[in-house]
Amino acid sequence: MSNEHEFNIRLLEVFRTEAREHRQAILSALRKLEKGADAEREAEMVEKSFRAAHTLKGAARAVNKSQIAGLCQSLEAIFSLLKNGHGRLGKEMFDALYEAIDRIEMMESGNEDGDSALNSRLNVLRGALDG
C-alpha cells in the first residue's frame, strides 16, 4: 500500500470518529430543545448545533464527502436562521433534522447516497424560517 493510500484510510477513520461526535452533539442538543428550554438554554443548544453542523460540513469536504457536506450546509443554514431569531422549531422541523442526522450516519458508512427529497424538504423548511 502506498503512503497516500494509508493516509487516506486514516483520514477517513478520523473523519468517521469526528462525524460521530458532531452528530451526537447535534442529537443531544435537539433532544434538549425538543423537551423545552428557557430562551438562554435554547440559544445555547442552537449555537452548539450550528457549530457542530459547520465543523462536520468542513470535515466532510476535506474527505470529499460532498453529499454529507450538502446536508450539513442545509442544517447549518437552518440553525443560523434559528440563532438569528427567524422562526421556531416545530414537530415538522424536528422530524426533518432527525432524519438528516440519520441520513448522515448512513452516508458515513457508505450505505446510502444523499437524498435529494430530504435536501429539498430542508430547503423548504429553511425558506419558511427565513420568511
Q: Residue spans of the language-model regions?
A:
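Non-catalytic helical tethers at domain boundaries
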Residues: 1-131
